[in-house]
Amino acid sequence: MTSELLVAGSVALDTRDGPFGKVRETLGGSAVYFALAASLIMPVKVVAPVGLDGAKRVAQAFSGRTIDVDLLQILDARTYRWRAHQDHGRNIDLGSSDNIYDSWEPTMPANFEGWAFVGSMRPDRQAQLMGMLGAAKLLAADSMLSYVQARPPEARDVLRRSGWFFCNEEEFSALGGTDPEEFRRQWWLQGLVVKAGAMGLAAYTEYGVVRVPALTSRPILDTTGAGDAFAGGMLARWLSTGGLPAGLLDALVWGVACASITISSIGVKGIAKATHKELEQRVVEVEECLRRES
């Protein structure tokens, strides 16, 4: 079915410190943030590996949501770990333990023809997953600065396979980008989303550029996962409303609203507890901000 949404990505146990204090082995990961945001709008399938030490926390976070975990593999391995220090809204990577990818043999729905997002993870695995999603009507991917820097050829392979690509300004520069529209054409992308934190974001397509401001009137406690939550909200909203070019601005607004809910709390707490009604209220705030800046 072309109306299905799937995310393939990471499940993580994060240890981070920043203005919010310190959290140790709290639930995170690209697949988790994306799925929690998307499931506020429509059902979503999750493809990811998790160790025995993290499976219970994932089940608790996903409880009550329309999240299909049939392809979430629980392995006898340590869940992916990530350590970071947050400074001025930016996560400085302090290292990770990603050996779980070595024992993971991912499976996909046969001939999946819906929309798929391959979240940040070790790029060789990203590329493998994208190769398994060749029939997807829309195939999107995200990046992670540390992997772009450590594995540039594999990161570019992910970019080459993408229809839509999501990155922040640092990742864009690390991939050799200077002019976003030129970059989009160079890599034959249907769409490129460049995120600029508190400055908002811009989406580049063959129809032009669409900009949406960040919602700065709300408190910002922890920016981790904001990009994945944004992608989940944006793609779920766009797909659920038909996926036409005219609906892109609306979809971006919903994505920003999901990101705003996420960063208002530490870790996944905010987006995991959010309701559709709360999301709709946040969308109104983003729309008001957009009107003020237009």
Label each residue range with its predicted role.
Residues E4-L5, L13-E25, L40-G119, D124, ...:
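Conserved N-terminal subdomain of the carbohydrate kinase-like
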Residues G9-V11, S30, A229:
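Active-site metal-binding loops of divalent metal-dependent hydrolases
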Residues A35, S39, L239:
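Gly/Ala-rich phosphate-binding loop of Rossmann-like dinucleotide-binding domains
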Residues L36, R81-H85, G200-Y204:
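Short beta-strand scaffold segments in enzyme catalytic cores
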Residues A38, N168, G227:
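Short, conserved phosphate/pyrophosphate- and ester-handling motifs at nucleotide-, phospho-/glycolipid
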Residues K45, L215-R292:
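Conserved post-catalytic alpha-helical subdomain immediately downstream of the catalytic base
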Residues F117-R122, S143-M144, N168:
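Catalytic beta/alpha-barrel core
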Residues A135-L138, L145-P213, P219:
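Conserved phosphate/ATP/ADP-binding segment of small-molecule kinases
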